């Protein structure tokens, strides 16, 4: 069954586990999966968990790209990136990138979240291909994947997703990471 929630979620036992199978099979395996996490979901038929994970990661990519774009603008306008993220976290724009990615991995200078650009590219491709198959317009997903591919071209498929921030630093001539 696919999982989502990052390394922090895995350590804390809070990852989302997406199970696609018959309902009676789900009821049998749920107690076993609850040992790993309290967040176990029956998503429908076989394969639905994979579709949901790919869709979730496409949404994560879109939010991450949008967040880096806006924080880059704010930094360019003279606002400290730490202040920008702190305020956004208490406002309607908060998301995984402002909660985890920026403070824990980019603003800290760590630059490691534990999820590669190649894995994100795989999931974004699955979700976008599914959109094509279902004749669903996904313009933000397509644009976000294009920006991800710019990062992959520069840093490779094994690069951490935190490197997407470097693409924005370079494009906007700003710095999100500490100077040290």
Language-model features: locations:
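Rossmann-fold dinucleotide-binding core
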Residues: 1-61
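ATP-dependent carboxylate/acyl-activation modules
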Residues: 34, 175-180
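Helical "substrate-binding/catalytic lid" subdomain
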Residues: 28, 48-171
């Amino acid at each position: 069954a696919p999982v989502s929630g990052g390394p922090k979620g895995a350590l804390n036992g809070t990852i989302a586990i997406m199970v696609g199978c018959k309902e009676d099979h789900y009821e049998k395996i749920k107690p076993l999966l609850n040992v790993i996490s309290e967040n176990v979901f029956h998503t429908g038929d076989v394969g639905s968990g994979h579709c949901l994970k790919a869709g979730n990661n496409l949404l994560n990519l879109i939010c991450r790209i949008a967040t880096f774009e806006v924080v880059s603008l704010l930094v360019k306008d003279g606002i400290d990136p730490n202040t920008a993220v702190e305020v956004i976290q208490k406002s309607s724009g908060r998301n995984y990138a402002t909660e985890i990615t920026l403070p824990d991995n980019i603003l800290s200078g760590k630059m490691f979240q534990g999820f590669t650009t190649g894995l994100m590219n795989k999931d974004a491709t699955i979700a976008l291909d599914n959109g094509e198959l279902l004749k669903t317009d996904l313009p933000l997903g397509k644009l976000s994947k294009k920006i991800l591919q710019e990062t992959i071209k520069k840093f490779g498929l094994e690069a951490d997703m935190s490197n997407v921030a470097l693409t924005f630093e370079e494009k906007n001539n700003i710095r999100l990471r500490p100077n040290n």
